[in-house]
């Protein structure tokens, strides 16, 4: 179990209050597909992902980005049991979707970029440090069901 200080929880929640789950989720998934194009292979049902413009304009990318940040929202509301909160999602990605768990780390990286761009100077090194810890906890929780 991860120990969160009251200050860390406050930092996570303070940043999260500024997040637009729909817009920022779309931005994060769009970035993932553009920066790491091989991650698109898990999304063959999404249709046209042939260019940055096609990815950015794809309604399925938009909807799935929102869904991803919705799961992160759930984890933030359950910081003391992120692994338990994301257990079913981990099982699904490991056993049904067969997603390479390294992609969770990549998604975390692009989310950090999205948050940094959105918050500017407010995303200080100290804030980033807390968010890097949170992303590591997310990645660990989502990777838990892999053998």
Curated annotation (Swiss-Prot):
Q: Name one GO biological process term.
A: hydrogen peroxide catabolic process
The protein's matches in InterPro entries, at most eight in alphabetical order, are given as: Globin, Globin-like_sf, Globin/Proto, Hemoglobin_b, Hemoglobin_oxygen_transport
Cellular component aspect of the GO annotation: blood microparticle; haptoglobin-hemoglobin complex; hemoglobin complex
- Looking at the record, the residues that make up the Globin domain are 3-147
Q: Which GO terms describe its molecular function?
A: haptoglobin binding; heme binding; metal ion binding; organic acid binding; oxygen binding; oxygen carrier activity; peroxidase activity
Keywords, comma-separated and alphabetical: Heme, Iron, Metal-binding, Oxygen transport, Transport
User: Which residues take part in binding heme b?
Assistant: 64, 93
Tissue pattern of expression reads: Red blood cells.
Which family would the database say this protein is a member of? Belongs to the globin family.
Subunit info?
Heterotetramer of two alpha chains and two beta chains.
- Annotated function: This is a tadpole (larval) beta chain.
Q: What is this protein called?
A: Hemoglobin subunit beta-3
């Amino acid at each position: 179990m991860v120990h969160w200080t009251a200050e860390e929880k406050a930092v996570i929640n303070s940043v999260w209050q500024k997040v637009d789950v729909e817009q920022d989720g779309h931005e994060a998934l769009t970035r993932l597909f553009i920066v790491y194009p091989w991650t698109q292979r898990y999304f063959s049902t999404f249709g046209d992902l042939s260019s940055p413009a096609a990815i950015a304009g794809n309604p399925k990318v938009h909807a799935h980005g929102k869904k991803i940040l919705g799961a992160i929202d759930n984890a933030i509301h359950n910081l003391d049991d992120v692994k338990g909160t994301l257990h079913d999602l981990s099982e699904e990605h490991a056993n049904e979707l067969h997603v390479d768990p390294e992609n969770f780390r990549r998604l975390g990286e692009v989310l950090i970029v999205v948050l940094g761009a959105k918050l500017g100077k407010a995303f200080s090194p100290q804030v980033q440090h807390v968010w890097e810890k949170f992303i590591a906890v997310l990645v660990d929780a989502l990777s838990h069901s892999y053998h």
